[in-house]
């Protein structure tokens, strides 16, 4: 079913955006599935949803970003989401990417080294194109020990 959604999105093209609020929240929930095939299909579908004419369409990607913050339940799913962001977010230069900031910060504090590594790469990429102000503001809302650690990473 998930693969079919991706194929339909691919065929429909950028007009698929009008269905994002209905379909994407349900698709994103699958990032936590225990079956690797389901998780892989989920990210393939998400890519087909946002990539048209061989480029990420920021007008489609940006509205779906908020759905990820409630979907991530494990370190493994956080890693995969951050990796997907690393591949897709560069197309959003100059746009509002604030919905992913808490996810990136959680990734920086994650217990899993691979998750921290991809979060650090994503943060570095983001900070070359966007201001660190929103990251610092969000980090300040965390526990003092976490806020201090995050501030060091952000600056």
Per-segment meaning from a language model:
Residues 1-155:
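Extended, low-complexity, acidic/polar intrinsically disordered regions
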